[in-house]
Amino acid sequence: MIQSTQPITALLKLWESERLITPLDRHFALEMAQLHKVDLHKAKSGIDLVNEQGEQAYSELFLLICALLSRQLSQQHTCLPIHQIRLDNPMQEPISNCQILCSHSEIIALLAQFNAISSPELEQANSPSTPIILDSGDLYLQRYHQFEIQVASYLTQLADAEVSELPAQLNTNSSTNISANTSAISSTLDMLFPQSDDMGVTDFDWQKISTATAFTKRLAVITGGPGTGKTTTVTKLLFLLTQHADMTIRLVAPTGKAAARLSESIKASKLRLKQELAPFADKIDLSSLIRVPEEASTLHRLLGVIPNSPKFRHHKDNPLRLDLLVVDEASMVDLPMMHKLLSALPEHARLILLGDQDQLASVEAGAVLADICAGLKQKNTRTNASDAKWQMRYSSDYSEYLSNLSGFDLSPFVSPLPKIGDSLCMLMHSHRFKGDAGIGQLAGAVNNSDKDRIMQVWQTGYDELQWIEHLKTNAGNSGLDELLTQAVSHYRHYLEMAKDSKDASEIIDCYNEFRVLCAMRAGEYGVDGINQGVTTALKQAKLITADTEFYLGRPVIIQSNDYNLGLFNGDIGLILPDMSSQGSYHSSYQSSVEDGNASTHAPRLMAHFIQADGSILKVLPARLPSHDTCFAMTVHKSQGSEFANVALVLPIWPSPAQKQLLTKELVYTAITRAKQHFTCLGSQAVFEHASLQATQRSSGLARRLWSQI
């Protein structure tokens, strides 16, 4: 069954030393092999693959498969598709030390014989659970299998809720019955979304359609790139709902930074909406804008953290107290967290997911938003069109109803696919980037993996785009030197503000004007190396002292959750003087910094973090959980943030393992963090490789939601 240069137990050590698997992967495989044995009689009677090697051959195969399954989870996949295993090189080594000598179908048949593995197709509902599940040719750890099944079930139930059920669930009076008041609701939608002069007869206002969808469905998934108006759309929706119902509405995002941005965006959208609706003051109740919430929180805070426990206060048996939940940056929500969130929703509640399906998937296992939107990627069989605007999927009945409500003929989007398509809407037009703006053009070309267009954009010479080529010589890397000079120029502003006793919020806002993003964490061109380079350059420029661990102006990023302090992985703060206790700087403080002797008169320094509500959380540096300096951060950690200026650093000669991490989603996410200017330090070959390689996360969620794709 297996031909290898060494026993699998020895190869596991080799693969661990070569970082093809983690120590956890190896220990998991060994533990499973020790605890669970093959039923050899069952295997012999099931298939004719037993030879003179007997049980040992089965054990070797089981050991290898367990290591592969654990590695999949380490790489954020939720399952191991057996048919994707490379039989000639299962671990994808530079030179293979192992081959599997049976077919994929035979592997599946063999795995079904182990007492550690059960299959939904074969087992009865009351059968004892097993640690590993084999489902439709995919291998799962039991808990991830349950997460996936239950998330699919929750979402399907929400999507299948009939429109006629909603008024009662919203506790609205009979005069607000949606079906009976289509004309009145349609008129309000017309006021919220007046037709623009440049809209053609065949154009669709997807913001308006999204609002109508979310108004009539318990589940609404609104996806779109940066600047497409997701927050504007949801603000108008919430205003429309508050016209007809007294609802408890909560706004959340995965991180504190994303929650703060959501709050800011909602506030700004409400101000714009009030101005836009002023001409209709005699026809619409503007006072209900007050009932549109502005304050967003994190998912952890919403669910209720229990210190030193993976569980939350709110769950299936103690649901959240709300009628509508809006989740922004949904692409960042992993499968286990989405399961916890959905299970905590009360039965009557609505859910709105906002996000960009083309961004990087969550840091942990799963790609939930991408799986939910998977059906939108299929070509419409009726129109045979591949243009993005033809990717909606509506059932026949709902298409007709939504057409009447929105005023747009949606019949071209009728599809036989499952009804979850009725809950989805993709926003197309970016209002942040003009049609000829370099950042938007580059992001679009990368997202489409259009090699020729990518090069054309770079060669056009857009003012908001800058390319820095790696030029490595014996004297160093002039490209890296140029990037470090740029970093010093940008970071100078907030560091000088810190010396001048400016307001902490203003200093943090200034710091957030620029960020260096890295594809990798380790290495000279990873977060570790770039942070060290920027620190050295700033010290040489006498902008920081860096003689102590917690120096004035040091940015820190939290690497582990501390529920007692209210700090979570990815939170970013600055080491600044605590002005509330000090009152003011000593007059000689700034000069002492410049002389490199700041400790003499320095006021007490605290780590300052902006909270979702705009307040400042101050923490003694010594109490901070695991953290790092944050002049540079990974692209993954930047999700949910925006910066005026972004510099992306790519490695010069990435290893095979690093190449797997360089994807178009990573580059696209980095580009779209920039609002005004984007710089890339890299080589053409590496940028091209990343832009043409799409992220593939193994999951069965899309199959469960879109059973016909």
Where are the predicted features?
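Intrinsically disordered, low-complexity N-terminal extensions of AAA+/P-loop NTPases
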Residues: 1-96
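Intrinsically disordered, low-complexity terminal tails and inter-domain linkers enriched
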Residues: 40-56, 96, 123-124, 163-187, ...
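Interdomain "pre-motor" coupling segment immediately N-terminal to P-loop NTPase/helicase cores
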Residues: 98-171, 181-184
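Conserved pre-motif I regulatory segment
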Residues: 184-219
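ASCE P-loop NTPase helicase motor core
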Residues: 209-211, 215-457
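Residue-level recognition of short, solvent-exposed, well-ordered loop/turn junctions
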Residues: 346, 549-552, 568, 638
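Conserved helicase motor core of P-loop NTPases
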Residues: 358, 362-556, 562-564
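C-terminal accessory regions
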Residues: 571, 577-578, 582-709
